[in-house]
Amino acid sequence: LMVVTSNADRICTGITSSNSPHVVKTATQGEVNVTGVIPLTTTPTKSHFANLKGTKTRGKLCPKCLNCTDLDVALGRPKCMGTIPSAKASILHEVKPVTSGCFPIMHDRTKIRQLPNLLRGYENIRLSTHNVINAETAPGGPYIVGTSGSCPNVTNGNGFFATMAWAVPKNNNNKTATNPLTVEVPFICTEGEDQITVWGFHSDSETQMVKLYGDSKPQKFTSSANGVTTHYVSQIGGFPKQAEDGGLPQSGRIVVDYMVQKSGKTGTITYQRGILLPQKVWCASGRSKVIKGSLPLIGEADCLHEKYGGLNKSKPYYTGEHAKAIGNCPIWVKTPLKLANGTKYRPPAKLLKERGFFGAIAGFLEGGWEGMIAGWHGYTSHGAHGVAVAADLKSTQEAINKITKNLNSLSELEVKNLQRLSGAMDELHNEILELDEKVDDLRADTISSQIELAVLLSNEGIINSEDEHLLALERKLKKMLGPSAVDIGNGCFETKHKCNQTCLDRIAAGTFNAGEFSLPTFDSLNITAASLNDDGLDNHTILLYYSTAASSLAVTLMIAIFIVYMVSRDNVSCSICL
């Protein structure tokens, strides 16, 4: 008799199961439950403004200039002269229209309120040590440089702004009306710097205009630099007396403007009576990013955000209010985003005894196996020992590396978009550095959609890569098992030996050696001879005789039936002779 011994177990590749699924969005599959996620967004809360980490942050233009507005510093008010520290980031903290505590200025006739903002846009700012024009000998002179009691100096004597010289005709001979005169404004800063030149003109009542300049008619003024030309006509009379910062009341007004001269470029000013000629100029270089905020600056932060203040970046993206931000900032997106950090969610697969082997294999592909500690992909063994599970850490690490690569790619996308957002702001450093909100919002919406699509595609790739990892596991398993197992499909192999938890752990660790496990012995035929005993026929012998007789009878009957069939078909003739 032949006896065959089977010790076969079945080993399959598989994916872990989880009882706490999360949901991610994908490009083609919609929302998919996965075993883990990496949140990519946060919703910040409002905080105070802070110094930007890793760089100098400028609050007031001149921190040591007490009781001075930034416009006072920018115009060179006598009591507000000081050093402006260098900075790569600046806070636009004066949100209301700001005046200067000196001679009354008609701020709304020019862009002069933007001058402090312009200066904030530079990293390095210094006031020249000498004057750009000799005001006393300028065309239309000689002049005396006028001062005012409403603009006291540090000794409380009469003074005036350091950036301008009030050119008053020196004697009665030149206190007359004049045709437009032109003066060149040379570039006196260092090569590579921008020169910001401040100038203006004085207007007063008809009586005062005649007294100071010999002409009561409106005067014309023009400035030109870098292809930008600006025209003004003075307004005569009709001003109520006004005092600034406790100074003497004044019936007159001054109009102040500025021009930006690029390195080596000359500017021109065409004027009549009442000119405020340029004197000391601002020399500026480098770029400092400007953002609206508030003082004081408390502590440090990764990012400064107009709506939320100082933020420390914990996620690459944020939801909530969109606004301008500078520094190492998250990018605004419309909806929360999550990156898949695991496998597609599968409920625990049913055991063999519940579904049968092939049913369990199908369930294994549809479901997952519990017990793969610290791993997403691995192996299961089915046999007399029950079900053993072991995680394959290498394939799990490869999956994690792919997710990390996706995360880094999204971070690179974030940096590029951040540069794109701030780039336009840098290019407008000669202006107030504010973009139209509608244009900015449209740009933000576009970038948000790009980022959301990138995350959807990343999730799609991560989830779809499960098949790739399982196929790699299957090839690895097949190579390790070698001739000790038979491939039965669906990522499963039937082994010719037992494979318990120890065996499975070695497979997962890549140290499996089939020779260490006992292979089964196959006896192709085990024949036991029958023998006659002295006691006569035993049961085995009787059974043998019975079998022989029954077989002979069956053969005889079959032959007889065949002959009868052939005769009936006339294929065989039968002759009987006596």
UniProtKB/Swiss-Prot annotation:
UniProt site positions, description: Cleavage: 355-356
| Glycosylation-annotated residues | 33, 67, 153, 174, 312, 341, 500, 526, 539
Name used for this protein in its record: Hemagglutinin
Q: How is it modified after translation?
A: Palmitoylated. In natural infection, inactive HA is matured into HA1 and HA2 outside the cell by one or more trypsin-like, arginine-specific endoprotease secreted by the bronchial epithelial cells. One identified protease that may be involved in this process is secreted in lungs by club cells.
Further remark: Major glycoprotein, comprises over 80% of the envelope proteins present in virus particle. The extent of infection into host organism is determined by HA. Influenza viruses bud from the apical surface of polarized epithelial cells (e.g. bronchial epithelial cells) into lumen of lungs and are therefore usually pneumotropic. The reason is that HA is cleaved by tryptase clara which is restricted to lungs. However, HAs of H5 and H7 pantropic avian viruses subtypes can be cleaved by furin and subtilisin-type enzymes, allowing the virus to grow in other organs than lungs.
Function according to Swiss-Prot or TrEMBL: Binds to sialic acid-containing receptors on the cell surface, bringing about the attachment of the virus particle to the cell. Plays a major role in the determination of host range restriction and virulence. Class I viral fusion protein. Responsible for penetration of the virus into the cell cytoplasm by mediating the fusion of the membrane of the endocytosed virus particle with the endosomal membrane. Low pH in endosomes induce an irreversible conformational change in HA2, releasing the fusion hydrophobic peptide. Several trimers are required to form a competent fusion pore.
| Xref: SUPFAM superfamilies | Influenza hemagglutinin (stalk) (SSF58064), Viral protein domain (SSF49818)
- Which parts of the sequence lie on the Cytoplasmic side of the lipid bilayer? 568-578
Topology in the membrane?
Single-pass type I membrane protein
Q: Where in the cell is it found?
A: Virion membrane; Host apical cell membrane
GO annotations of cellular component type: host cell plasma membrane; membrane; viral envelope; virion membrane
> Keyword Transmembrane helix on this protein?
yes
Q: Where is the lipid attached (S-palmitoyl cysteine)?
A: 574, 577
Q: Which cysteines are joined by disulfide bonds?
A: 12-492, 68-80, 102-151, 499-503
Q: Can you tell which superkingdom this protein's organism belongs to? A: Viruses
Please give the residue ranges for the topological domain Extracellular.
Answer: 1-546
Instruction: Give the GO molecular function terms.
Output: host cell surface receptor binding
InterPro entries according to UniProt: Capsid_hemagglutn (IPR008980), Hemagglutn_HA1_a/b_dom_sf (IPR013828), Hemagglutn_influenz_A/B (IPR001364), Hemagglutn_influenz_B (IPR000386)
> What family is this protein classified in?
Belongs to the influenza viruses hemagglutinin family.
Give the primary localization class: virion
From its record, what is one biological process in GO terms?
A: fusion of virus membrane with host endosome membrane
Transmembrane segment boundaries: 547-567
Keywords of the record, alphabetical order, are: Disulfide bond, Fusion of virus membrane with host endosomal membrane, Fusion of virus membrane with host membrane, Glycoprotein, Hemagglutinin, Host cell membrane, Host membrane, Host-virus interaction, Lipoprotein, Membrane, Palmitate, Transmembrane, Transmembrane helix, Viral attachment to host cell, Viral envelope protein, Viral penetration into host cytoplasm, Virion, Virus endocytosis by host, Virus entry into host cell
Quaternary context: Homotrimer of disulfide-linked HA1-HA2.
